[in-house]
């Protein structure tokens, strides 16, 4: 039996998993390859998982602001009914410090 994939994705962290998810939604068959036994157990697992919209460019800020709405409604975006296993999203606010060097 021969198995084929339309795309091979190296890495199954946040970027690789998101790429595979979006390609699958478009109908592509994907194969994800990662050095770890489970997805998200590389550098993604060490992330502090901060979602922010404060960036130095308008484009970066606009992109992050759009992403905020995906995170806020993550279960709906993924189309899951059972939220077990999903990343918890909690808004806590932030404090941005302005100094003479920034």
Describe the residue ranges of each PLM region.
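Glycine-rich FAD pyrophosphate-binding loop
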Residues: 24-44
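Beta1/beta-strand and adjacent pyrophosphate-binding region of the FAD-binding site
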Residues: 1-15, 31
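Accessory recognition modules or surfaces
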Residues: 2-8, 40-47, 51
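Short, flexible hinge/linker loops that cap or flank conserved catalytic cores
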Residues: 1-2, 24, 89
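Dinucleotide-binding Rossmann-like beta1-alpha1 core, especially the glycine-rich loop
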Residues: 48-102
């Amino acid at each position: 039996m021969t198995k084929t994939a339309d795309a091979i994705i190296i890495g199954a962290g946040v970027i690789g998993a998101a790429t595979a998810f979006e390609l699958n939604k478009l109908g592509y068959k994907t194969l994800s390859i990662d050095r770890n036994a489970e997805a998200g157990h590389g550098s993604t697992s060490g992330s502090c998982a901060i979602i922010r919209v404060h960036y130095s460019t308008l484009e970066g800020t606009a992109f992050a602001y759009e992403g905020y709405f995906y995170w806020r409604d993550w279960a709906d975006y993924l189309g899951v009914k059972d939220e077990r296993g999903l990343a918890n999203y909690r808004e806590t606010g932030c404090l941005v410090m302005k100094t003479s060097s920034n």
